[in-house]
Each structure stands twice: as structure tokens, then as C-alpha cells.
């Protein structure tokens, strides 16, 4: 069975909102772009490495729209752009009707948990999710996330959307910790499940 891997940029206080710029100002969030002072080539290399382990993306509508607007216009021959365009993408949305923004995209409108379980049962590499806080929370509540790859940035934002859902205890096991020179640390966790449940 394939794994669902959540890949997030996160502050020390667990905030994942708007790491790249002003892509998400919900709740009056004004601190977008907080990853850039810490970004470096080694993080780029890690991102390429992690994408090579994924052959399907699962995204919420807002993340899908932001990514599509960034990756689809990239010129043919750009390695990252070509890979992201070719990768099958599933976008969870009850309102999206047009997927022309980003090729190879399919909308999941209903029965989300059942559809995700069916995707996991298909052969292939990992299914990757980034951003998409509402979707990540729903999958966590149904114990469908198999791994969290958290790039923890050395700052406290004080508020914003968080990686983990409120009110739910989760026991995780650290399987990798990798520091980067800028102070960012990759923390790779897997849920601790009953023996034989994985």
C-alpha cells in the first residue's frame, strides 16, 4: 500500500500558513514569506529528493490553485516544472469546476476519505501533500497520514494555521532528523500505530 506523506514548512510554534508569500491571508495573517530568510541550496536539494519519492499529489483547492499558477506557466524543459506538470494531481474541492489551470488534475468532490483510501490502495510511489491544512487535518483525524516531513524553521510566528488538528492527541515516532546550516531542521515522523496497523 502506498504512503501518504505530508510535507510542510513549519515554524517552531507549529504554524504552516503562507510560508512562501501572501498566498494565504486567512484570519488576517500578515507574516507570509517567512521561509525566505532561511532558504538555501541544501533545502532545494532536499525538496528535489523528496519529490522523487512521490508520483501523485493530493491537495486542497487553495494550495492547488497557488501551485498551479506557479508551475503550469514554467517553460517546457524546466525540470521542476515538467515534473510537476506530469505528476497526477487530485484536488479536494466542492466548488472547483475547471482544472485547466494545471494539467493532469482531477477533482475529488465527495466521499473524500473513501477516495483517498482507494488512491492509497493503488500501486505506485508515495502520495504527497503540502499546504492544504484542512485536508491534512481531515486525513489525520482518519489516521490516513503515514509520514510527516516537517521542515522546522527557527522562528515563532505567534499565530496562524497549524499543521496538526486542534484537540487530537497523536503519538509520533521520529525516524530522521537532519539539520541545515541556516538553522532549519528536517524532522521526519511516522504515527505510532498498533502493531500490524501500518
Locations of the language-model features?
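Enzymes that bind and transform nitrogen-containing heteroaromatic metabolites
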Residues: 1-198
